[in-house]
């Protein structure tokens, strides 16, 4: 079903993710291997995005219960939001779309187990790894990945992590900074609006700015 998403877009004349992504550098590096493998071949992807779980301490308006446990908790308590086009963040609708994650302990999640079984082989040719969430700093697998990368250097790997920079426990940010200090190069992308005192996010701006300042000072 995952592939059919791109097929449907292409059938109506759209530009699908697979067409867009196939033009990026990491895909070009695998062209010969893809051609040799053929249509029925099986090769390791060069670009992987992983979401270990939906745990998050925020409920950003543009987000959703299937990507934030805090959002899910609020919707369960108060119900979906009535808007012009219907109900926003309706749990029944998300469930029918099979977007709500299965409630399992980390050590019982078959998808996480499968990821770590595959990881050593995948890592050999991986060029881009994105860790999203939820809030990635709330998941131990994020730190496990960082430890593995440190112990097994990959000069070709570009790794990114999407974080709100204010995990619920300060020690999580401390651990993150400690791991980053061991990496060779760090690049930062941020949205200035999120750190704007006039944005209405005053409760968030102060701790976020503090953590962000520490983050950018990592050498």
Question: Which positions does each model-derived feature cover?
Answer:
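Glycine-centered loop/turn positions within well-structured domains
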Residues: 58
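Core AdoMet radical
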Residues: 45-55, 66-110, 123-140, 152-174, ...
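Residues in intrinsically disordered, low-complexity segments of regulatory proteins
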Residues: 25, 115-118, 188, 202
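Alpha-helical packing segments of well-folded alpha/beta enzyme cores
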Residues: 1-2, 48, 115-118, 145
